[in-house]
A protein has these predicted regions:
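Short beta-strand edge/turn micro-motifs at domain boundaries
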Residues: 106-135
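Short, cysteine-centered beta-strand-loop-beta hairpins and adjacent loop/turn segments enriched
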Residues: 95-104
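A solvent-exposed, acidic/Ser-Thr-rich amphipathic alpha-helical stretch
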Residues: 26-82
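Hydrophobic/aromatic beta-strand elements that line small-molecule binding cavities or substrate pockets
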Residues: 75-80, 93-95, 108-114
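Residue-level preference for beta-strand/loop junctions
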Residues: 72, 85, 89, 104-105
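Short, low-complexity N-terminal intrinsically disordered segments enriched in polar/charged residues
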Residues: 1-35, 134-139
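Short beta-strand segments enriched in hydrophobic/aromatic residues
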Residues: 33, 93-95, 126-129
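Anionic, Ser/Thr-rich low-complexity intrinsically disordered regions
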Residues: 19-21, 39, 50, 109, ...
């Protein structure tokens, strides 16, 4: 697989994961995750480790998602760097939940991929809120 094909595959995986999220299908998300993968979620204060913790996280995440209201997602084109069988994808995700419990924001995401048997799998997914600048300093 050449570099361009790998970048296209990784980009397709990322878009597929968020489409699965919108469609309430965590099993499809898990198809792309290494069994030992870790997750820093933007709304979760602790590191999520491995498949067992991710299953609980998915259940809780789907519950809060469905309680909020309809969701709109916009993913910016990922920037992907590849080194042999490792890759890092960096991108922005913009989300907006509608009523009855609206909220919106932007998240910067880094995914670390590892190639196993010629297929890319996520070994770490990291989300962080996009800062709005340096906080004001009171004098």
């Amino acid at each position: 697989m050449n570099k361009s094909d790998s970048i296209n595959e990784i980009t397709t995986i990322i878009k597929g994961i968020f489409l699965a999220f919108e469609n309430h299908n965590p099993d499809e998300i898990e198809m792309y995750m290494h069994p030992d993968a870790t997750v820093w979620d933007v709304f979760t204060p602790h590191l999520i480790r491995g498949k067992h913790e991710r299953d609980k996280f998915h259940a809780d995440d789907q519950e809060q998602m469905q309680a909020r209201g309809p969701l709109k997602l916009n993913i910016e084109e990922p920037e992907v760097d590849i080194w042999s069988d490792f890759a890092i994808a960096k991108y922005y995700l913009h989300y907006e939940y509608q009523s009855p419990n609206p909220t919106k924001g932007s998240v910067r995401i880094t995914d670390i991929f590892y190639q196993v048997n010629k297929a890319w799998t996520i070994v770490h997914h990291h989300e962080g809120s996009v800062p709005e600048g340096v906080p004001k300093i009171e004098s």
